[in-house]
Amino acid sequence: MAEEESDQEAERLGEELVAIVESPPGPVGLLAAGDGRGGAGGGGCGGGVGISSRDYCRRFCQVVEDYAGRWQVPLPQLQVLQTALCCFTSASASFPDECEHVQYVLSSLAVSFFELLLFFGRDEFYEEPLKDILGSFQECQNHLRRYGNVNLELVTRIIKDGGPWEDPVLQAVLKAQPASQEIVNKYLSSENPLFFELRARYLIACERIPEAMALIKSCINHPEISKDLYFHQALFTCLFMSPVEDQLFREHLLKTDCKSGIDIICNTEKEGKTLLALQLCESFLIPQLQNGDMYYIWELIFLWSKLQLKSNPSKQVFVDQCYQLLRTATNVRVIFPFMKIIKDEVEEEGLQICVEICGCALQLDLHDDPETKCLIYKTIAHFLPNDLEIVRVCALSVFFLERSLDAYHTVEELYRRPDEEYSEGMSTVQNRVRFELLPILKKGLFFDPEFWNFVMIKKNCVALLRDKSAVKLLNENTLENPSSSLKKRVDQQSVEEDQSTGETDPDDASVVQPKGQVNVKRSLSALNTSKVDHSVPRHRCMLCNKEFLGGHIVRHAQAHQKKGSFACVICGRKFRNRGLMQKHLKNHVKKIQRQQIATAQQDDPEVITLEEINGSKSLISFENGNSNTKGLEIETLTASSERNKEVIREHMAEFIKIPIAIPENAIENIIENGKPDASFNNISESLPQCDDDYEEEENEDDYEDDYDLNQETSVLHKINGTVCHPKDVYATDQEGNFKCPALGCVRIFKRIGFLNMHARTVHPTDLNVRQTVMKWSKGKCKFCQRQFEDSQHFIDHLNRHSYPNVYFCLHFNCNESFKLPFQLAQHTKSHRIFQAQCSFPECHELFEDLPLLYEHEAQHYLSKTPESSAQLSEVVPNHQEIDPFSNENQTIHHPVSTSKSRKYSTEPKTYIDTMEKKTDSLVHNGNEHSDDTVSNISLIDQKMPAIEPNPENTHSTTDLVNGHSEIEQTPLVTSDPTLKIDINRNRTENGSILPSVESQEHSALSVSQAPSKPNLTSEQTSYGLIVTKPFVRPLPPSYLDERYLSMPKRRKFLTDIVDACSDQDNMYKKPVKRLRCGKCLTTYCNAEALEAHLAQKKCQTLFGFDSDDESA
C-alpha cells in the first residue's frame, strides 16, 4: 500500500510541476534580468507558454517542499526528489546557463539527496527501488552538466563510490584508527563542509557519540572547516551527552571566544536543546563574573535570564539564581545588567530588589572606582524619583565624587524644592529598605545635610568645586551690584521699625524703587548721619525660616521649646536642658561675630574694636532689660571712620554704668556641678575670648553628651545584674559628691558621668582609676561576659571594643568587627579552623580553644609585678625618685589643653590662676616672653601637685569651710618633688611678674635669690594702671575649721583624711530612735510622723479582731 501511495503522489507531483510551466507569465517586473522566454518545452514538459526562471524556481521549491513534508521516512522522500529532479531537468532546457535561481535549486536538490542517502548502506544501493532512483539521478546530472553545479557533481561521485560512508579515510577517522593529518585534511578539503556537518548531525541523532566526536575533532583541526561554529556546537553537545568528558568540556570552553559562544548558545536553543543552551550560557558567564571581565557580559546575562525562565518559570527561583551569580562576581559593574533583567522580569517586587542590590554594592570598597559609585547613586535616584530625601542625598554624593558644575546645579535644583514629608503608602519600596538605605547613602557624605540649611550646603559645595572658573561664576552670581546694595540700604531704613524688634520677613521684597535721583541722594545723606549699625550679623532660624538681627535669635529660640526637648535654631541640634541649648546657641553668635571682626580687620586696617579702646575688656549689654545671666551677650562694635569712633564712644558712655562681667570658670562651674557657685558674688573679671573655637565646642559637646546620658540616670545602678548604689563604689564627701579616685586628684563631681569622663581623659593610666573601674564592673566585660583578674588586663580588653562595631573577631589576622553578637557568631563559622592569637604585645601564640587563650593572656598580666594602691598612698611626698604623674604624662596621647584643664578644675582660685590670667593678657598684647609663659602654664595645669592637710604645707581646700567661699581662700603654690615653681622677679614692660618653671637642681638657688619682703609695684600703661601685689599666706584659722586644726600631726593626703573623717563621723552617729504604731505596727523615724499617722485614725488592728481586754 505504501508503494502504491508513493507512486500516486509522484504522479500528482509531476502533473503540478508541468502545470507550473504551462501557467501564464507573471508581471514584467517579476522577470529576472537575463531570463529568456522559452519556446516549446522539451522532455516531459511539452511545448507551452514559457515562464521566467525566477517564478518557476520559486513555485517549484514550494511544491516540492509540500510533497516531501508529507513523509517521515527517507525512501518516499527520495522518490519525491526523483520526480522533482526529472521535471526540473525537462523545464530547465529553456533557462540560461548562468542563472542564479537554477543553481540554487540544483544545490538544494543535491544536498537533500545526500542527506537522505545517509540512511542507506552500500548494499542497499543495488536494490530496488533505490537502484532506479540513483540511476535517474545520474541521468539527470548528465543533462544538467552545462550548469556545472559542484554539489550535484559531488553527490554523483559519492553515489559511484558506494555511498556517503564508504570512503577509506572516513572509515579510518570514524573507527579512530591512526591516520596522517595531511591525508585527513586532503579528504576533508575534497568535499563540501556541509556534507560533514550532515554526517555529524546524523551520528549525534543516532547517539553514535564516539564516532561523532572523532569526526568533529578532525573537522575542528582542519584550518578552514574549523571556522564553522557548528562543529564547536556539536562538540559541546557530544561532551554534554557524555558526562565523562567534563575536563574536555572546560578546556574547549576556554578556547572558544565569548562572542562565538553567544552564537553557539542561540543556535543550540533554536534546535530545542534548552538545558544544553542554559548550561553553555552559565559555563561562559560564570568565568566572566569571577574574572571581572565585562566582555559581552550584557548579552550573556540577557540570554541566561531568558533560558532560566524558560527552563523554570518560578520568579523566586530566578531571583535566587541572580543572587547566587552576583556573589561570584568580582566586578561591581555587573549589578547593572542584573538589575535590568530583574526589573524587567520580576516587575513590582523587582524594584525593591534592585534598590537592595545598590545598597549592598555601596557597602563595598569603591574608593578606586568613583565612576561606578556615581552610577550607583544615579541608579538609586532613578529607581526612587519621588523620594526627595534620597534623591537629594544621591545628588550630593554624586557632587562629592564628580565636583563638577553640572552636579552642583542638580544639587541646587533639588534643595530649592520645598521639603516633602515621607509617606510610607506612597513609597515604592518597603519602609525597612528605605531606612536601611539612608545610613548607607550618608556614609559617603562629607557632612550630614539633615542639620544644615541650603546656605551652608551651598557654601561648602562651592568650596569643593575643582573648576576655578565655575567657582568665580557662582560667586559673581551671588554678589550684588552697587545699585542693588543702595536700594537695599534704602529699604532697610524704611523698615527700621521691624529692625527694632529684631525680626525681618524673608519673603518681603528687599528692593524699593527710588522716586528720582533726589530721593536717592536724600536717602544717602540720611544713611550717613544715622547711628544705626547695619553691619550687625543676621541669623536665620532653620526651624521657621525667619531672620533675626544680632543676638535676638537667642530670645527667639524660646518660641520653639518643647517639653523635654530643646533644639538649636541655627544647626538643629537637640538638647534636654534649656541652659545647655542657650549656651550652645550663644557660641554660634560669638563665632559669627569673631569671624566678621576678623574679616573686617583684614579688609580695613583702620577698624577699631573695644579691645583697643578699653584694654581688651568686653562690655556687657542687657538685651532683655534684666540682669539675668542667660540674656547676657558680648557686644563688639566696629568702625571704619571717625564718625563710627564717635558712635563707639557714645555706646561706651551708655554701657559703662554696667561693668558686669562673668568669669569663664564660674560659668563652667555651673555647667559641671549643676548649680551656681559662691564665686558668683565676687565677679570682677570680664569674659575672656576663647583662642580655639573648635576646642571650646568639643568640650561643650562632651559636657552636653554626659548631661544627656546622666539626665535620666537612676540613683541605683546595676553592676552585672546586681543592684548597687554608686556611693558604694566611688568615694563621696559629706554632701554626696563623687571624688576622683586618681592619686593626688581632688576633683569633686555631682554626677558619675562627669567623673567617668574626667577619669578617661585625664587619668587613663592611674592605678586607682583602673581598680575603681574594675570594682564597678566586678571584673566582667559587659560585651563578651569575660571575667578578668587584673585591672590593666581589663582596661586593655575594653579598649578593643571600639564603637560602633564593638564585637570583634578573635581569629588570627581577622580584623572584622560587628554591631550585633549574632553577626559575630555567623562570621566565626566562616573560619574552618578557628585560631585565636594572644592580644598581648610581641606574643604570637595561637589557640584553638578560648579557655586556653584566656588563661594564657592572664599569665602575661599576673607575671607583671602589680603596684598596690596602698603602697602608692604611703609614698612620702618629698621622695625624689617617685613621681605619680610621670607615667600619666607619658601615656596620654592627647594632652589636655589649658582651657580644657581649667574646665576640669574645681579648686579655689590660687596664685597660679592669677598669674595665668595676667600671662594671658601679656600674650594677647604681644609680650616677648609669651611663648615660654604659655608652655609653663600648660605644664602647671597638667601637673598639679598633691595637697596635704598640714597647716604648714596646706595649699588649697576642696570644700567650703566655715562659710568661706573659694575665692576668699588664697593658698600658696605647692612644691612638687619633681617640679619647683619659683616666682622670679622678671618684670615685663607693664610691670607684671612672670612665673617660671625650674628644675629641682635650680630650685634652691631660686628661693635664695627671692627677696623676703617684696614691695608693692605699679606702672602706668597705655590701657590702665597695673598694681602688682605680693602674695601673703593667711593664717590657718582663717580658712580651716577647728576640727582640722586639732587633728594629729600625721602626713596624709587630703583625700584620705576626708575619708577617715567621714568614716569616723559615721561611727559616732547615734542610732536613730524608731517609733511604732500600736495598732498596725508601722514603724516611723520621728514622733511627728507617728502623731500625724495617729491623727488620721485610719489604721486598723493587724489581725482584724478585737483583743480579749477590749471585749471584756
From Swiss-Prot:
Annotated region (Disordered), positions in chain: 482-514, 885-906, 997-1018
GO molecular function per UniProt: DNA binding; zinc ion binding
Modified sites of kind Phosphoserine: S1107, S1111
Keywords: DNA-binding, Metal-binding, Nucleus, Phosphoprotein, Repeat, Transcription, Transcription regulation, Zinc, Zinc-finger
Family: Belongs to the krueppel C2H2-type zinc-finger protein family.
The protein's name: Zinc finger protein 654
Subcellular locations according to the entry: Nucleus
GO cellular component: nucleus
Mapped zinc finger ranges (C2H2-type): 566-588, 738-763, 779-801, 807-831, 836-860
Cited function: May be involved in transcriptional regulation.
Residue spans of biased composition, Polar residues class: 886-899, 1002-1018
Bias type Acidic residues, positions: 494-508
